[in-house]
Amino acid sequence: CLIILTSCGGGGSSNSSETNPNGSDQDINLSTEICSNTNRDRLLKCDLKHDNRDRFYYVYAPGNLDSNESIPVLFALHGYGSSALTHLNYTNYFPIADTNNFIVVYPQGATTATLSSHWNVGGWTSKSTVKDIEFIDTIINLLKAKIQIDETRLYSSGMSNGGYMSYHLICNLSERFAAIASVTGSMTDGTYDNCSPLHPMPVLQIHGLQDFVVPYIGNSGSKSIPDVIDYWVNYNSCKLEPNQLIKYSNNFDLVIFDTYENCLNNVNVKLILHPEMDHTWPTLQEYGVSASNEIWNFVSQYDLYGFIE
């Protein structure tokens, strides 16, 4: 059954399976996944068993979806201790997806005895044994089995721990993802020191100087934001001096937009730095910056091969 049209149950899927073309040889058995309607139009909740854990994710399909065309997918990852539904509500991606014709996936992080709902990114989550890279990879394969997704245009975005996870994904699953965006996230030492992307990677970081949860200057559990930006600027062989744009926010604060250009495959690395923003997802009304719009406008420029001409 098509995930964009109706709810999917195990009984209707028989024993359909798919082998992961990226080499993990992971069998995807649709009969182990049950997708059901929610109280929101075109939003399904999909439950599955992964690594002996009960996991789930939400998937939103735009109203104008053309089932004959491949469609991009944006993963939206919540922060530590939060939930997929909470993230869904404050990111408000639905109207953007409707206008631009892409699918949004909201996975739910796992909870363990020592950690609240989280994404396993090493570092400060090192007590976790949850296989989140494989979980995201499995979701991609499950989507592929149900709908014609554009596998060259898979993107990840996230808030805080979800931003860390977006970086973790492109360091460990770069054959899947074309671009990412992090809001108030960073990279753990483990992610930073063991990062091996297979292609130039567009990266957007949105951060506030008043964020003391994930400080701009870094701490024992996080790289500083300048270190993160420098990593990707150097990895992508970008011009070292950014093209800088300064805008006034609603409170007449100066918001800095640094775009590093002339990178391999014509990708960019971008930092949006707000002097008054704390650990939050900025909106146009409150901070003069819409993270959700900035994210889609940035990532949608790229596929796995770089800038889309």
Describe these PLM feature segments.
Residues 8-73, 85-88, 128, 154-181, ...:
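A domain-start/cap signature at the N-terminus of enzymes
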Residues 205-207, 211:
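Short beta-strand/loop motif that positions the catalytic acidic residue
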Residues 47-155, 164-168, 172, 194, ...:
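Serine-hydrolase catalytic machinery in alpha/beta-hydrolase-like enzymes
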Residues 212-224:
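Conserved alpha/beta-hydrolase "acid-adjacent" motif
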Residues 75-77, 183, 274:
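Alpha/beta-hydrolase
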